[in-house]
Amino acid sequence: MQENRPVIALDFPEFSDVKDFLEKFDPSEKLYIKLGMELFYTAGPQVVYYVKSLGHSVFLDLKLHDIPNTVESSMRVLARLGVDMVNVHAAGGVEMMVAAKRGLEAGTPTGRQRPKLIAVTQLTSTSEEIMQNDQKIMTSLEESVINYAQKTAQAGLDGVVCSAHEVEKIKAATSKEFICLTPGIRPEGASKGDQKRVMTPKEARTIGSDYIVVGRPITQAKDPVSAYHAIKEEWNQ
């Protein structure tokens, strides 16, 4: 499946920043918004309720990683917020991921669709050197990512967060329907920031990404609405 809207990462420190940003867009335009840790820890569920009240889709990016029971109960709560997608760290293991899905299913109100559940493989800020030196995972970065993707599929999750560079091999190792959501997307000429493994929207589409996440190239642009539409157009070519 492919989401035709780029997911906008609203990595803002304050709830007011979210309101200011979304007010720039025509109310009829429904966006896909990623809300991360800093914002959720600052504003709590109210920021989710606000974004959903405007008709936008929400990916709540909290990257849960804890013992299975804690993750299960946490997912039960998150499901009640009405979000469209949530995630965990694949490093938590199959048992934890199974528990996460079970919690989501239990918490989803009757008549609503369960939020999509995906897992983080290796962060796009992680290089092979970092992985081997800091995590002591002595395989290649690609092998680690594919292993995590296979474990995620085994647990029955919907997909993974991964670099666009790994999409083709992940789908070959799992299935074409397995979701690959790719951050680290930058238009041609944009700064890479703290991302180590990046691609353009067009490259990500060509290689088979299902969702792309774009933050600063939109949120820090002089004209965020125009920047969003340009990236959306490139993504849908």
From Swiss-Prot:
Short name of any one Pfam family annotated for the protein: OMPdecase
Keywords: Decarboxylase, Lyase, Pyrimidine biosynthesis
Residues involved in substrate binding: 11, 34, 61-70, 124, 186, 195, 215-216
Catalytic activity: orotidine 5'-phosphate + H(+) = UMP + CO2
Gene3D superfamilies named in the record: Aldolase class I (3.20.20.70)
GO biological processes: 'de novo' pyrimidine nucleobase biosynthetic process; 'de novo' UMP biosynthetic process
Domain of life where this protein originates: Bacteria
Enzyme Commission (EC) number: 4.1.1.23
InterPro entries registered for this protein in UniProt: Aldolase_TIM, OMPdecase, OMPdecase_AS, OMPdecase_bac, OMPdeCOase_dom, RibuloseP-bd_barrel
Family label: Belongs to the OMP decarboxylase family. Type 1 subfamily.
Assembly, per entry: Homodimer.
Free-text function comment from the UniProt entry: Catalyzes the decarboxylation of orotidine 5'-monophosphate (OMP) to uridine 5'-monophosphate (UMP).
Name used for this protein in its record: Orotidine 5'-phosphate decarboxylase
